[in-house]
Amino acid sequence: MRPARALIDLQALRHNYRLARELTGAKALAVIKADAYGHGAVRCALALEAEADGFAVACIEEALELRAAGIKAPVLLLEGFFEASELALIAEHDLWCVVHSLWQLEAIERTQLHKPLTVWLKLDSGMHRVGLHPKDYHEAYQRLLASGKVARIVLMSHFARADELDADATAQQIAVFEAARQGLAAECSLRNSPGVLGWPQAPSDWVRPGLMLYGATPFEVAQAEAERLQPVMTLQSRVISVRELPAGEPVGYGAKFVSPRPTRVGVVAMGYADGYPRQAPNGTPVLVAGKRTQLIGRVSMDMLSIDLTDVPEATVGSPVELWGKHVLASEVAAHAGTIPYQIFCNLKRVPRDYIGE
């Protein structure tokens, strides 16, 4: 069997969820949208269900997958609904729903439901993606209450730059949110992963840890609380070929690496079809036979090459960690000019193995 696999440590997942609770004292929705950022939504939900206050996904399709797997905990639809016809399913399956636009509010008002909804009313506090304008927020809240279709409302917004700890934007968003919710008697939710780790002043009865659940930092610089996270995924494979090259020889497509010295080259069963970033350049760190080395040459669809010159003990069959506990996903993402969110979500072909259940 091809050795490219993702090892998912569910005990580390639980540790990171508990850390979100510990740091905030709030209730926490575990964000498991996009198949739990490539970690497997159902398995992650089952691992957390005994202690999680609820889950958050992008859309009703993701929520129904959890319900089909027997997950009974609250599930929030972060994008809300896309058509009014979804409201009956939302009520039937006891899902919670974000309302971020007036058309959604109007759809709720005119739809007959057999049970009232739990709505998370989203404010655009400055990100300008989705969310109600502050001038419409109070009226929307009152209309939801008056509709007779809503049993509970949670007030929410989303940070745009909370991963930048020295930026003024987050404090400004907090101020906009605080002003908009004045006089509204409801719980609130502001803090995502960087909010949990770096913005203790942000009000939140509910927090929404996403990336931090999987043990990756949302920050580009070191941050004390993020250092306590435990990586959940280890992307691993093995060396499948070794060759010796003299100085001056090219490696891989486009000859993007030319050996500056006699070089021992290892080929690893891992490529961009597995989700490893094709744009990862020469020098991207990897771990082989327990020692750090680096990527050389362009990443191929199914294979990549690494420098084994200074790892003489590595040979065919030696284990390789592409990211995990020793080579952080954030390191690989930074070298590739992207973010850990993306490299996790890009994993499609790699089978997953679970430990710590």
UniProtKB/Swiss-Prot annotation:
Family matches, as Gene3D superfamilies: Alanine racemase, Lyase, Ornithine Decarboxylase, Chain A, domain 1
Metabolic or biological pathway: Amino-acid biosynthesis; D-alanine biosynthesis; D-alanine from L-alanine: step 1/1
Residues carrying N6-(pyridoxal phosphate)lysine: 33
Biological process according to GO: D-alanine biosynthetic process
Primary enzyme class: isomerase
Binding site residues for substrate: 129, 301
Keywords: Isomerase, Pyridoxal phosphate
Cofactor: pyridoxal 5'-phosphate
Temperature-related activity annotation: Optimum temperature is 35 degrees Celsius.
Catalytic activity: L-alanine = D-alanine
Cellular component annotations (GO), alphabetically ordered: cytosol
MF GO annotations: alanine racemase activity; pyridoxal phosphate binding
Record-linked HAMAP family: Ala_racemase (MF_01201)
Purpose: Catalyzes the interconversion of L-alanine and D-alanine. Is highly specific for alanine as substrate. May serve both anabolic and catabolic purposes.
Protein known as: Alanine racemase
